[in-house]
Curated annotation (Swiss-Prot):
Gene Ontology molecular-function annotations: hydrolase activity; phospholipase A2 inhibitor activity
Protein name: Phospholipase A2 inhibitor gamma subunit A2
Coiled coil: none
Alphabetic keyword roster: Disulfide bond, Glycoprotein, Hydrolase, Phospholipase A2 inhibitor, Secreted
Similarity section: Belongs to the CNF-like-inhibitor family.
Keyword Glycoprotein annotated: yes
Oligomer and partners: Heterodimer of subunit A and subunit B.
Glycan-modified residues: N157
Keyword hit for Ion transport: no
Annotated Gene Ontology cellular component terms: extracellular region
UniProt superkingdom: Eukaryota
Compartments reported by the entry: Secreted
């Protein structure tokens, strides 16, 4: 199977086609969004994906301070997949749980704050790594926050993404029950 490979800021990208090998034999598109109120930052990535990544479909991480890191994954039979845009941010009620919250770009060490979990968010997730870019160089990232479920994150050596990402840490723990302040 041949799939389009590209990465860009915004909602779409144009790239080149390449043959994909098993197990990454499905074409896919990932939209990522960082939404610290009141602005949002979006990137799009088209690549060869495995069926396990395709099954993830979406993830939402509550970073605290009204900020979210969200992803939408769509796989298809065509070379160039399309994905629906993001729905509005989930503004559900606080649920009494909390996690360390941080969005560190360009640094794997970032100062934490408390992220107050909402709705069904009862897990804490932590993702630390580097994204290798030609310009301006490697980009470190450190993401922590509340989430509803913990995806299995692995990068296969067979994909282009394994050559562009270095996952240092992926951890998922139960969120802490917060005590109401007097």
């Amino acid at each position: 199977r041949s799939c389009e490979i590209c990465h860009n800021l915004g909602k779409d990208c144009e790239g080149y086609s390449t043959e994909c090998d098993s197990p990454e034999d499905q074409c896919g598109m990932v939209l990522l969004e960082v939404s610290p109120a009141p602005i949002s930052f979006r990137t799009v990535h088209r690549n060869c994906f495995s069926s396990s990544l395709c099954k993830l479909e979406q993830f939402d991480v509550n970073l605290g301070h009204d900020a979210y890191f969200r992803g939408r994954i769509h796989c298809c039979e065509e070379e160039k997949c399309e994905v629906n845009s993001f729905p509005g941010l989930p503004f559900s009620q606080l649920n009494g749980y909390s996690c360390p919250g941080v969005l560190g770009l360009f640094s794997e060490d970032s100062s934490e704050h408390e992220a107050l979990c909402r709705g069904t968010e009862t897990k804490c997730i932590e993702i630390v790594g580097y994204r290798k870019e030609r310009f301006p160089g490697d980009i470190a990232y450190n993401i922590k926050g509340c989430t509803s479920s913990c995806p299995v994150l692995r990068l296969s050596n067979r994909t282009h993404e394994a050559n562009r990402n270095d996952l240092i840490k992926v951890a998922c723990t139960d969120a802490s029950k917060t005590t109401p302040s007097e």
